[in-house]
Amino acid sequence: MRPCMDGKRLNLHLVSDATGDTLNAVARAASVQFEGSDIHLHRWSLIRSRLQLHRVLEGIEAERGPVLCSLLDQALRHELDEACQRLGLRILHVLDPVFDLLAEELGTPTRPTPGRQYVLDADYFRRIDAMHFVLSHDDGQALRGLAEADVILVGVSRSSKTPTSFYLANRGIKAANVPMVPGIELPGVLDDPPCPVVGLFIDAEPLIEIRRHRLTLLGQGGGAAGAFRPDSGDYVDEEAVKAELLWARRTCSARGWPTVNVTRRSIEETAAAVLKLMDAWHERRRRTATSA
């Protein structure tokens, strides 16, 4: 029996004994691949007792649809499996293939503990520290602290430097970002950077649209739009923007800094590209040190 659907609407139930963030990420990553379909996510988190599970089953029966599950308690899993079979609904235990693979490779069984990934550990505090670092080193602030950065992002105004920095901070990476402005010298620390420097670029047309939107939000009057005055025609003038981008690219090329074009990239994709370039930088340093 197939799940109940109204037209292209599908109810998808996410049942977890922790926050449910993992299931939610998996479900959203998969659902965006089905354009035009209305997939409605029902999140059931922190399910750790039979009473809680019974409430979940009531919800599933009321709005029937397949189930993605990450429960670790075997008794609760068994009861949910039986209920889905009775209702004619499909269920997928999302983490099981990963557990099976790791158990086989490591030669050791899992020790199921709900929410273990959320225990406050060194990684958690590393992410918090990185977030504080980004806040204090955004848009060229606190230049003296750049030596402590894991990566320095450079680019023209509105090239996604700040959101990419915060995404990296959530991975525990101290990312500073420095604006590139024609006529203004870059900080001296970038002459001999202690960490990878990556230039972020965007095509001229979308950059102009982003900047125009920024000016609209600022009301054309108060505040600053990146490193430019919002009433400056150069900020959104096509020829000026193209010249600005060309200068920035040549600067990065002359200094040997790799670049990432963020046009049509999500922040996650941009961050992944930056991480790959960071790995390459460290690998070159390692090889140089080994051969010295």
From Swiss-Prot:
What GO molecular functions are on record for this protein? Answer: ADP binding; ATP binding; phosphotransferase activity, phosphate group as acceptor; protein serine/threonine kinase activity
Would you indicate the residue range of the signal peptide?
none
Which reaction is catalysed here? Answer: N(tele)-phospho-L-histidyl/L-threonyl-[pyruvate, phosphate dikinase] + ADP = N(tele)-phospho-L-histidyl/O-phospho-L-threonyl-[pyruvate, phosphate dikinase] + AMP + H(+); N(tele)-phospho-L-histidyl/O-phospho-L-threonyl-[pyruvate, phosphate dikinase] + phosphate + H(+) = N(tele)-phospho-L-histidyl/L-threonyl-[pyruvate, phosphate dikinase] + diphosphate
Instruction: Identify the EC number(s).
Output: 2.7.11.32, 2.7.4.27
Tell me if Ribosomal protein is a UniProt keyword of this record.
no
Task: Identify the domain of life.
Answer: Bacteria
InterPro entries per the record?
A: Kinase-pyrophosphorylase, PPDK_reg
UniProt-annotated binding residues for ADP: 155-162
Cited Pfam families: Kinase-PPPase (PF03618)
> Any idea which UniProt keywords this protein has?
Kinase, Nucleotide-binding, Serine/threonine-protein kinase, Transferase
What role does this protein play?
Bifunctional serine/threonine kinase and phosphorylase involved in the regulation of the pyruvate, phosphate dikinase (PPDK) by catalyzing its phosphorylation/dephosphorylation.
Q: Which NCBIfam families match?
A: PRK05339.1
Sequence similarity: Belongs to the pyruvate, phosphate/water dikinase regulatory protein family. PDRP subfamily.
Q: What is this protein called?
A: Putative pyruvate, phosphate dikinase regulatory protein
| Organism, as annotated | Acidiphilium cryptum (strain JF-5)
